[in-house]
Regions:
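Bacterial N-terminal signal peptides
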Residues: 4-14
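Short, low-complexity N-terminal intrinsically disordered segments enriched in polar/charged residues
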Residues: 16-70, 74
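Low-complexity, intrinsically disordered terminal/linker segments enriched in charged
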Residues: 23-37, 160-189
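A solvent-exposed, acidic/Ser-Thr-rich amphipathic alpha-helical stretch
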Residues: 69-120
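Short, surface-exposed coil-to-beta transition loops
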Residues: 108-111, 142-148
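A short, structured loop/turn motif at beta-sheet edges
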Residues: 116-123, 151-158
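A short hydrophobic beta-strand element
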Residues: 121-131
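Beta-strand elements of well-folded, non-transmembrane domains
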Residues: 131-135, 150-154
């Protein structure tokens, strides 16, 4: 009897073990990265690299509906992937529509780039963004900091754009009701 229980115990313990569920919010980024890994990019230190970096800086320095319409398809490759922590998009057309909607809901959107670093074909842009939203805190500037990972194609267009920033501080803390709850949660940590 005891021997039978000893044999049964490991089986019972194994049956009771659960595998934790992993909610992988990074999977779309990893999928986009994998499909854009072997794409020929820019030569480090080249004029094409310098121009691609300047195009990106100009695009985000003072976004308007007109500038977005004129520049998005020069800045982003047709098959580009973008995730700004608020939304994930594929394709320059979808990215253009998203940025147009963004600037329509804002009084102004400007970014100042403080640093750019390159490693293995990945470019990291450290920035400060000032946003004045029409409906959230009208008339007030919301300043946030972040880093954007960019991978360029051979024409200097963005293939991959992944933002790393605190979207709760940049947007959600300013939504009536929601902002109070988020600030309360943050205060408990």
């Amino acid at each position: 009897m005891r021997f039978g229980l000893l044999l049964l115990l490991p089986l019972l313990l194994a049956a009771c073990r659960t595998t934790p569920v992993v909610l992988d919010t990074a999977q779309p980024f990893h999928d986009a990265l994998a499909t854009r890994t072997n794409v020929l990019g820019l030569t480090k230190g080249s004029e094409a690299e310098r121009m691609a970096i300047e195009r990106m800086k100009k695009f985000f320095s003072a976004m308007t509906e007109e500038s977005v319409r004129e520049q998005t398809r020069q800045v982003y490759a047709p098959e580009a992937y973008l995730n700004d922590t608020l939304k994930s998009l594929s394709g320059a057309a979808a990215i253009e529509d998203y940025f147009i909607a963004t600037v329509r809901n804002a009084e102004s959107v400007t970014a100042r780039f403080e640093d750019v670093a390159e490693s293995g074909g990945n470019y990291y842009f450290r920035w400060v963004m000032d946003t004045r939203l029409k409906k959230l805190r009208p008339g007030q500037t919301i300043r946030t900091i972040g880093v954007t990972l960019v991978r360029f194609d051979a024409q200097g267009r963005i293939l991959l754009h992944q933002d790393f920033w605190d979207s709760t501080a940049g947007v959600f803390e300013h939504v009536p009701g929601v902002g109070t709850a988020i600030r309360g949660i943050k205060a408990k940590f």
